[in-house]
Amino acid sequence: MPKRHRLLLAGAVALLLLGSGLPVSRALYAAHDTMVSADPADATPHVVDGKVDAILPMGNRIYVGGSFTQVRNANESRVITRRGLFALDPATNKVDETFVADFDVNPDRTQDRGVKALAAAPGNNELFVGGEFGTLNGAAARKLVKLNAVNGALDPTFDVSVSAAVKDLVVNGSRLFLAGDFTSVGGQARGGLAAVDAGSGALDGAVDIAFTVPRQGNEPRVETIAVTPDGTTLVAGGNFTVVGGQARWQVALVDVVSRPAKVIDWQTDRFDDRDLGQSRCASAFDSHPRDVDVSPDGAYFVMVTTGAYTSRGSLCDIASRWETSARGSGLQPTWVDYSGGDSFTAVAITGAAVYVGGHSRWLNNPKSDGSNQSATPGPGSVTREGIAALDPASGLPLPWNPGRERGEGAWAIASTPDGLWVGSDTDKIGGWTGAGCEGCEFHQKLAFFPLAGGAAAGQPQPIGLPAELLSVGPAGLVKRSFDGAALGAPVALGAGGDGSRVRGAFWLGGLLYEGRDDGRLLRWSYDGTTFGNSEQVDLRGLPASHQTYNAIVVGFPVADVTGMFYDRGRLYYTLAGDRRLYYRYFLSQPNIADVVVGSQVLVASGEGDALDWSRVQGMTAAGGAIFWSEGADLRRVDFADGRPRPGSVST
């Protein structure tokens, strides 16, 4: 027998769907089913100076790279000299003193010199090290080397000359992809991206795509790369605007299976700020992408940026999700989370969460104070100091909130089956609030958050049919069976608050959310028989009307809503007398204080698609369709990829 779900119809009628189930994905690095604990492990080693730029879990060791020169074990005063790279045993949390690989790094932050990237060689017996360095253990070794994973000895059979700094490394099958400032690899021209044989170091002639014409300055650069788990697609971000002769402003996708490799038909204008005038991103940054990661199932990637936030559609100081399979030009992100003016520097996706690090103070903050390059908390913003976990569906901040002394940023985040490692340039993480350090934890430049003790994450999946349709009126809730075509007999439930004041409602994960005529958003728990006490959702200062600041629309006119429904991280709604169907991102959580209403307002329909949503009297979505009440009629339209399909309306 098909499983029954619940839909709700509110306002004159309000439709809600109730369902369950969280997305499950295959591991790319180390996938998790929950968030990690917000309490970092107590005994991880300290990095005394410099900063951590790279973390590589491999075999039974964790390798840490950066610009440091000294490390020490927790609860020990003895300092161990390690220049740019060390290994630790995660079983004991002690530095592995048998592994020695000292590079000519500089812990001075004004000198961009050190180990920037690490990657595991096939077999996990060796590792690749890339960066800006010239010697290893006193002998010449420039930009890229391969080391023994046990003792750090150089593998002399792997000898690849690289003309300038290596910024990122990815091993895919038998190939090592490298990205950076270079113009040649192995004596042959390569502009920012190259591939070599992971065993011999021989240059792969199939990967010869030039990244050229910098956004700013004279030197194009590929800053960050990631490859999908199936090995077909490479995502690149950096200081370039032309890739393989095609316009690609700072972000590009490359088909690395084809021989030769070719630029994929994936193009967006959202990283192009040329036409924004005074709202361009800050000239102090030649490019904006700082890190990218691909989801464990390969379906999407998240790019994080710097650049000084200016709104007007620019993607500076943001985290944004993009679908890997999308094709065409003028593509738009699935979601964007704005810090309001603080940089993001690292990202790692575990399936349960998207972890981002930087020197951010807030998330869900597209408005700031409306002035260029001014970082302030705007309406709807959520405080997150230096590190955060985002909901993969909506991009909104999950409750995970350890707090980190911000510094310049968290530069490396890496997941393992047991948890999450974070590398940075500061010494306090866990309990940090930004207002002081009473009770915060001391972990110099490196911390580990165990998976044990982490809370569940994720939101309910879309609802199928048949379902239960619940209408809200003066007498409370009335339930009917609904298969998408026919309604069953009404059954009065007589609960759910004063239905005459409801303006829109929706079911989500065992909870009934209702928008009221006084502008409040309330919710009740409901187990199918009994309602709990009402709770009020904190709108965090969102205006009671739509307001535009620097081309970003914020505000939530709850009192004017005529219908609502939830679908995959988005809350859709209609307004009285308005022909548009709006949406905003929405995060439901068990604790009412952790519920987040997205600040930014977006339009799904009603602008140029011949659909008119001004007469809605309650709505819901189920089985790939939107259902709404209009007068005496119950109407439907096909709903896919987050938008209704014009031409499919029926009554």
Residue map of PLM features:
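Secretory targeting and sorting signals
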Residues: 2-27
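Short beta-strand elements that form the blades of beta-propeller/WD-repeat-like
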Residues: 302, 466-473, 511-515, 570-574, ...
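Contiguous ligand/interfacial binding patches
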Residues: 596-606, 650-651
